[in-house]
Swiss-Prot record:
Protein name: Peptidyl-prolyl cis-trans isomerase B
Regulation of this protein's activity per its record: Inhibited by cyclosporin A (CsA).
Organism: Orpinomyces sp. (strain PC-2)
Enzyme class: isomerase
Single GO molecular function: peptidyl-prolyl cis-trans isomerase activity
Motif stretch (Prevents secretion from ER): 200-203
Catalytic activity reported: [protein]-peptidylproline (omega=180) = [protein]-peptidylproline (omega=0)
Stretches assigned to the PPIase cyclophilin-type domain: 33-190
EC number per UniProt: 5.2.1.8
Keywords: Endoplasmic reticulum, Isomerase, Rotamase, Signal
Length: 203
């Protein structure tokens, strides 16, 4: 009996440790890139690692919009909202002002889960208009934004190109936090995942 109880306790500890590991150091299952332009200037490339084992539906939506395989997506869309010491927001490829966008599942889809947290700069998370209103809009943090935990679905992190994120974050803005010179995703798509180097996101 004692052996059986010890076995159950051991398995429970292993399961808990696995869950904690998945939520604090999730595996990068997919990578996408954004090539960014502002006016005539190439700002560079942002590479984003996606956590498909934790939030597979959210990741698939973002990945497919990055590749444009559904006939629509992020290419030539804007970062329409930029707030220094907070985040940069994009993904509204239908209206370009933060009121549009759509997912590959329809106009909106439900919050998948809130297992991952907004722990620092470079976190990739879904923008929304309230509970279960995810579409195509997303944001990348430039600081820790723990007050967004449990409200926005985290699904990835910047692997390369935080300097580009910073350049966008610090650009001159107009009323409504809109960049004075439009910041455009000139090209985007998917990259192969290297198990050795891509597991660790850029801090």
């Amino acid at each position: 009996m004692n052996f059986s109880i010890k076995s159950v306790i051991f398995l429970a500890i292993v399961a808990l440790a696995t869950l904690v590991s998945a939520s604090t150091n999730p595996k990068v299952t997919n990578k996408v890139y954004f090539d960014i332009k502002q006016g005539d200037k190439d700002l560079g490339r942002i590479v984003l690692g996606l956590y498909g084992e934790v939030v597979p539906k959210t990741v698939e939506n973002f990945r497919a919009l990055a590749t444009g395989e559904k006939g629509y997506g992020y290419k030539n869309s804007k970062f329409h909202r930029v707030i220094k010491d907070f985040m940069i927001q994009g993904g509204d490829f239908t209206r370009g002002d933060g009121t549009g966008g759509k997912s590959i599942y329809g106009e909106r889809f439900a919050d998948e889960n809130f297992k991952l947290r907004h722990t620092g700069p470079g976190i990739l998370s879904m923008a929304n208009a309230g509970r279960d209103t995810n579409g195509s809009q997303f944001f990348i943090t430039t600081v820790t934004t723990s007050w967004l935990d449990g409200r926005h679905v985290v699904f990835g992190k910047v692997i390369e190109g935080m300097d580009v994120v910073t350049a966008i974050e610090t650009t001159k803005t107009l009323p409504g936090d809109r960049p004075a010179t439009p910041v455009i995703i000139a090209d985007c798509g998917e990259l192969p995942v290297s198990n050795n180097n891509d597991a660790k996101a850029e801090l």
